[in-house]
Amino acid sequence: MRSENEIDGVLLVDKASGMTSHDVVAITRRALNTKKVGHCGTLDPLATGLLLMTIGRGTKIQDLLMSEDKEYVGTLDLGKVTDSQDADGQVLETLPVPEFPREQIDAAFAKFHGDFYQMPPMVSAIKKDGVPLYKLARQGKSVEREPRFVHVYAHEIQSVRLPEIDFRVVCSKGFYVRTYVHDIGQELGCGAHLKALRRTKSGRFDVTGAITVEELKAGPREAVAARVLSLPAISRLRGA
């Protein structure tokens, strides 16, 4: 029999940089005193922003929520290629960065718009024979990966301060922004890695409505529980 104190729904959390998505799961479990907690779409430790936490019966719609489009804002750094494709990795190559005309930068971004295939990075949670690729990468191993069919619905170059470029991208499920940045760097001929990333939207949900990790840690349980969106509320928001 279920207790009246059990919580079902989705909690919007604004993940801080430097922590894993699993760290947020553990903090949420403690804050709500419940074991049944999942998350919708891993954010790398470097990244901040919206993480949908599924609570109780909310875990049953986790796959549905994960399938929705995402919006990110980020900063790429031209001239350095890293093994993880972001600033947390080891630098593999350093190249000079020309004074690119804006038209050339626009064209590089435009090449990765609409439908295309993307090769997942070795430093990722994708599994090969049950082993996450990032564990194989730590052992210095590289394995064949299947390219993924992805879609960019919208992109915007927000500012150019070479070697850095700030951008916004709206993309499909399974999209790696790190790889997007890496591929743009290859297109420009000088390499690039992801310096900063923030997820701002996931489906109909916006980070402006999220609880911070500090608020989550501070509690109390009742205050955190009050921020959980009920399953009927989720259906209404999604237009289901």
Language-model segments: which ranges?
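Catalytic/RNA-binding core of pseudouridine synthases
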Residues: 1-240
